[in-house]
A protein has these predicted regions:
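Extracellular loop-to-transmembrane helix junctions
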Residues: 37-146, 151-152, 470-479
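TM-loop-TM module centered on a large, flexible mid-protein loop between adjacent transmembrane helices
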Residues: 85-94, 100, 132-137, 213-223, ...
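Membrane-helix boundary/coupling elements in multi-pass transport proteins
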Residues: 82, 110-128, 243-256, 319-358, ...
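Hydrophobic, membrane-embedded alpha-helices of multi-pass small-molecule transporters
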Residues: 21-38, 43, 156-159, 217-288, ...
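A generic transmembrane alpha-helix motif of multi-pass inner-membrane proteins
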Residues: 51, 177, 185, 192-199, ...
């Protein structure tokens, strides 16, 4: 028999969650990543003009590639839960068992740092629109650096606590809730992305194809005091926190009834739709509003730019349009916040099952979901609300997010190279393992170099100050993984070993 043709069994621990959904559940909750277009598209086009379009397209395509790699990994490890970070550990543990534990712990904790802040960020943004629409008081206080209104604080806290309910009630209920939110937000969002097609007189192709920056200079001109390549890498740091987040669908493959089938459908669909929406929304803004108009700093606010865009396309305006856009954005933000509570909680749960995180996170409720891990996310989300603004949250959160994929992509390469005969219901071409390595290298450069440059840029939301302090706060949170790991290894594991009943001694002759 040809040994090379024998099926190899990959040893790994499953998350033990109920398998009660299908590809639609993973896809629709994973739309939380795609919905982040509402925040990043205005920032990109008002910062870089039409030059934002190719940069956004290229980085978003890396997100689709990531989805393809995760589709293969999730189908070959169908019991793992928590998405991307959960697939790193099995790739390393046989060759480097000691190091693999830290790869697993670091990757899951970095992913958590990348995703959980989406809940407070989105609820803060949603509260802004509610305060504006209902003309609520903007009186407030300044807890750290950015002022926050009392109404914003109250709405954000109430919203986060409210979202814990569908998250707690299980994956089936969460899917129904997410489906309703997705239909209410993504259908109008998709229509807005292509609305100019039905009003061709409102679109001006010349605004797009030269890819001019906001000041009228060319695509390869310097900006913000840096060369073109440096500044695009810097903005890629901001982009990766958003445009590759469509990988969130992978968090729920371990809860699908037929993961071998559902993984490739959910993640391919998520990636393809993500590339479409992340590309077409900036294209639509530039086509209709024009590069010169996008220099208006007021358009950084999503509600303002969407209202201005829709008003120009449909030659209308007024209170009704303001309400429609506000409702669409609020619903989109709520869906994304729901995944921020649910998704990375599963990563912490899986890390705890694997033995690198306190046992507290292993607990599941009667609905088969990691309730304590989700409650942990809620608690930290409530604390992060007090930072007051999106800029601060962006800067500290992406210290974890982008780097979390580097060990996973290297792990993909290792599994394809050293474990080629593991059953893979969905298998990419062999040469894709080198693409995975190249993607890991790109993400690392964006993370380490792009992050340093981006957080050094002056930010108008902070009165011209940079966000470097929040970048280093993110590093501090990232390194806090170590005491939690040591607590599990030095305190909990010895304690449980002492309490475990001794093994039965076989009787003589048995």
């Amino acid at each position: 028999m040809d040994v090379s043709s024998q099926i190899d069994e990959l040893d790994y621990a499953g998350g033990g969650l109920k398998q009660e959904t299908n590809w639609w559940g993973a896809f629709v909750i994973g739309l939380a990543g795609t919905i982040l277009v509402t925040g990043i598209a205005p920032v990109m086009v008002t910062s870089l003009g039409a030059a934002a379009i190719p940069v956004t397209f290229i980085i978003t395509c890396t997100g689709w590639l990531l989805c393809l790699f995760l589709a293969e990994l999730s189908a070959m490890m169908p019991e793992r839960t928590g998405g991307s970070p959960s697939y790193a550990y099995p790739a390393y543990k046989e060759r480097w068992p000691r190091g693999a534990e830290h790869v697993n712990g670091f990757t899951a904790w970095a992913y958590w740092l990348g995703w959980f802040p989406v809940a407070p960020l989105n609820m803060i943004l949603a509260s802004f629109y509610l305060v504006d629409r209902f003309h609520l008081s903007t009186a407030g206080f300044t807890p750290i650096h950015t002022p926050i209104a009392w109404w914003t604080l109250g709405i954000s806290i109430f919203g986060i606590l409210l979202l814990f309910i569908p998250a707690y009630l299980g994956i089936r209920f969460g899917t129904l809730f997410a489906t309703a939110l997705a239909l209410l937000s993504m259908i109008p969002m998709t229509f807005l992305a292509i609305a100019w097609i039905f009003q061709p007189s409102k679109a001006h192709a010349g605004q797009v194809f030269h890819f001019h920056q906001i000041d009228g200079s060319g695509l390869f001109s310097s900006a913000f005091g840096h060369g073109w390549l440096t500044i695009y890498i810097a903005f890629a740091f901001l982009l990766t926190w958003n445009v590759i987040a469509m990988e969130a669908a992978a968090c729920y493959i371990g809860e699908c009834k037929d993961p071998a089938r559902d993984a490739k459908i959910a993640l391919n669909l998520e990636g393809g739709y993500g590339v479409f929406i992340y590309t077409m929304i900036p294209v639509a803004f530039v086509l209709v509003l024009g590069v010169k108009a996008l220099g208006n700093p007021a358009l950084v606010d999503p509600k303002t730019i969407f209202v201005r865009f829709a008003g120009k396309v449909f030659s209308t305006g007024g209170n009704v349009l303001n309400w429609l856009i506000a409702v669409m954005l609020i619903v989109a933000l709520v869906l994304s916040a729901l995944n921020a509570i649910m998704g990375c909680a599963r990563s912490l749960h899986q890390m705890s099952v694997d033995g690198q995180f306190p046992r507290f996170f292993q607990h599941t409720n009667k609905h088969g979901v990691p309730d304590r891990a989700m409650l942990f996310n809620v608690a930290f989300s409530l604390a992060l609300v007090f930072t007051g603004g999106a800029v601060e949250i962006y800067s500290l959160s992406n210290v974890g997010y982008t780097i979390s994929f580097v060990p996973v992509l290297v792990g993909y390469f290792l599994l394809r190279k050293y474990r080629p005969n593991v059953n893979r219901p969905f298998r990419l071409p062999e040469w894709m393992k080198y693409v995975a390595l190249a993607l890991a290298a790109l993400f690392f450069v964006i993370w380490i170099y792009g992050g340093l440059v981006y957080t050094s840029l002056p930010n108008s939301s902070l009165g011209g100050a940079n966000t470097r302090v929040y970048y280093f706060i993110g590093w501090g949170i990232l390194l806090s993984y170590l005491p939690l790991y040591w607590y599990r290894k030095r305190i909990e594991d010895p304690k449980y070993a002492e309490e475990a009943p001794p093994a039965a001694i076989p009787s003589p002759g048995s």
